[in-house]
Design a protein with these regions (language model features):
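Structural signature for solvent-exposed beta-strand/loop edge elements and short helix-capping sites
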Residues: 1-228
Length: 228
């Protein structure tokens, strides 16, 4: 189309009255900022300027981050990719994100999601295989240089079915500034076995890249036998 969006597919039909193209099997959509989307079925509504699918689809950005969804709608005029349901992202650092709702601004390259679980890669985070570093949060907003989590909970404790982590760090807001390589917490509470121990109006520490590059140890707890 005139926006530079292209679709390739094995098979397609065109409804002239509704001005809708439907593709089948091995369909690939390429659009602005080198986003690429693959699906077995794509609907292109030229009147409403919406591209959509009710099938499992995979969205990949120019950096190699991979988004897997079970449905999507892409609003051409708003440059907005939206999905509800089972959503998974694997980023280039092998971190895994799970959402129930996701919206991606393909022009600004920003993302917002809800009901978020983030499983951080153990090796990149600098912890042993006995630890499971992770975040859960109500919402997440990701821009070029910052990641914002609202009502977030962080722990590195190993997952144990039916048991709460030995410790968690909970905060009203968690901000990761990739330029300053710092993680900020607002209204943070350290809990041990779900009991509040310390409260910090504000708290910050270097992100794991500082530890890897300089050997500087970030102030976080690891899983230990003393905490179960």
């Amino acid at each position: 189309d005139i926006e530079g969006n292209t679709i390739t597919t094995d098979k397609a039909t065109y409804d002239k009255i509704k001005d809708i193209i439907i593709t089948f099997n091995n369909s690939k959509l390429t659009f602005e900022n080198n986003y690429e989307l693959k699906s077995n079925k794509i609907f292109y509504n030229n009147i409403k300027k919406i591209i959509s699918s009710d099938q499992n689809s995979i969205l990949t950005d120019i950096d190699g981050n991979i988004v897997t969804v079970n449905m999507f709608q892409y609003y051409l005029e708003k440059h907005l990719f939206s999905s509800i349901g089972k959503i998974k992202i694997v980023d280039i650092d092998k971190n895994k994100y799970f959402f129930k709702e996701l919206h991606v601004d393909t022009k600004k390259r920003e993302m917002i999601g809800s009901d978020v679980t983030v499983l951080l890669d153990q090796e990149n985070f600098g912890v042993s295989k006995e630890n499971d570093p992770r975040f859960v949060a109500n919402d997440i907003f990701v821009s070029k240089n910052k990641t914002n989590l609202s009502k977030g909970v962080f722990t590195v404790c190993q997952k144990k079915e039916g048991r709460c982590p030995p410790w968690t760090l909970q905060a009203k807001k968690i901000i990761h500034d990739s330029i300053k390589k710092t993680i900020y917490y607002e209204h943070a509470t350290l809990k041990v076995y779900d009991m509040p121990i310390f409260y910090f109006p504000r708290f910050l520490h270097p992100d794991p890249t500082v530890k890897r590059q300089s050997g500087f140890l970030s102030p976080f707890f690891t899983n230990s036998s003393s905490l179960g």
